Amino acid sequence: MKKLQDAFSERPIEPIEVEPSILRRWTRRDLLLFGAGALATLAVGGSQLPREMWQRMGLDPGGTSGPENKWLLNQALRLDDDVSAALYSQHHLVPTYTQSQITPLKNNYNGATPDPAYIPGWHLILDGLSSGLVISLDIEALRARHGIHDRITRLVCVEGWSAIAWWSGFRFDDLLHAYPPVSQAKWAHLESSVNLDANGNPDPYFVSLDLLTALHPQTLLATHLNGKPLTVEHGAPLRLIVPVKLGLKNIKAITRITFTKDEPPDYWAQRGYSRYDGI
């Protein structure tokens, strides 16, 4: 191992040239898996790298759970986010399905299912608007103004499962045109004040969503699942369906949307997970 480390640290790094035609054949998933996988592999075996390499990065190796591994895993998450964002296109559509292909969709609240008592008095609060107003809308007003659009798409969970479901609702794009955000807004901060933790205590959930993704033609603010109004288990009366993102971005029981110029906080990003979560 000592000889290998010495050879590795002393050997000059030569540039690798890749033909542009080869890069063009790579899919986004190829790039993500290659980059994130390389960094994750380095994190797992990082303790075997020469100490001077860690020192050049301002780190001090301390074993498989040391700071260098956390640093590398964070870099892998950042690469995932950055590549996903860079390759995003509104022209990239996820596959759609027929009603015969619909599969069961489980209740996947991270904590306890909220008490349905919130539904009768539910309103959606809109903030960060160009008008300077803070607007409160009930579900009937939203349905009447924006009409109904249907999408049968796959919901993909970061835990490894997926389900095909028929969602109905109005496009996020329509909401943005009806209630324009403040000038130079780039983000939407979506909140659910009714979310609970595993013990049934209040645990507000919130996600950050870039407005380019909000404008994607398949992004819905859904009110129905498989032809019926949303139940509490699936985010009644209004939830986000954004099939180009992982399930954790598809926030249930939305109570507030705020448009911002700067990237807002995100529940899982604050807990060490990625923030973009593109598919």
Residues covered by each model-derived region:
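N-terminal secretory signal peptides
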Residues: M1-W26
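Intrinsically disordered, low-complexity segments enriched in small/polar residues
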Residues: A7-F8, A43-V44, Y109, A198, ...
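Generic secondary-structure transition motif, activating predominantly at the C-termini of alpha-helices
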Residues: F8-P12, H146-G147, P180, L225
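Generic N-terminal simple sequence motifs
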Residues: F8-R11, G46, H91, R239
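Intrinsically disordered, low-complexity segments enriched in polar/charged residues with Gly/Pro
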Residues: R11-P12, V18, N110-T113, L129, ...
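Near-N-terminal "mature-domain entry" segment
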Residues: E19-T27, L32-G35, A40-A178, K252-P265, ...
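Mature-region segments of soluble proteins
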Residues: D150-I152, F170-I279
